[in-house]
């Protein structure tokens, strides 16, 4: 009998270890990492940048940090967490920020108090209002992925990556179509908050503006863990970093930068208490050096922008002075800093906070929406020439280029051509503006005009590979 009991216990342990530390959910590999005796981290997938949900086993009950984009996945996660910690007493849920891949599963914890920053609910409502557009995007994108899968070699990493992506997108689409019940935070804070959980303390810090308006850090000193949400990572574990790809402010998002830096610095000062930095997605890591380097970077930008505003410098010259590769060479090309526009957005965000100036390209887009294309462009051209908006708005070539491509991708060719033509007028020495205008004319079927602008690019830069390529394509179609 004792021998049979031993076999049963061993079998049970093996079964539980498979259930908790492996297996699959909806065809996706399940991963559960033990961060300490009282903390686990769960995610699905070997390739997709899925949200990593963490759970803390406290004296007062189980605390969960973040949910996923698909509530049915959170149902499974909750069962696993309860099994692991030997109880079903879930007491709190904490959202590190507003985005749907961290809040859509909140309804699964509607029996808990839900903690978040005071701006979180507002952001969740914006996401909810955008659901139909997202559904439409999924319906267009999934068939494209399925086509890619049919062309990929079975068994390769690329094949597995695409397959996982399809599973996740279909799960999310099904959840959206079935109607996700938004469950908003019930307890919010502005600066920081502390939760006494008996065997551990949970400290919440405002960190808004580097990923969303409602970013927070979650610090558990007794466990030596700092959960950083989607704000940053300095190591990518896959070639699809997803939400962790950019370390950048979003122009237009209101934030309290001094408060953010103050909270950030206070955590740097407690480095001896932090053993591990935990990003909001499984496929990124964060080190102490990366954590500090990004703080120093943001502090430098704040000081330099403040100085430039005081000296009446133009934003364009400031962007040149603070060029990523020359001013921050150790960060350039590292995770979060692989795209120049992200760095530029950090500068622009601080600039707009200090000056109150708005983006001229955004102002033009609003005018087009209200007045129609012709009236808006004529009014904008007049205001640019007489300088009436020079103090209220800032003008940047790349922002107008982005606006033009926004229209181009929407197949609004007259709007795209009009924007690119304005960019040519404002920045006649830039070869890129002619290249963009040539592309717009080509997509609109105006080959002669497209050819003339690509020839203009080639005249400015005889070795321009793209211009040569496009001229060749146009000539072949004649």
What residues fall within each predicted segment?
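Conserved beta-strand hairpin/beta-sheet module of binuclear metal-dependent hydrolase folds
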Residues: 32-83, 216-231
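Accessory terminal helices/loops
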Residues: 151-153, 157-174, 269-273, 284-390
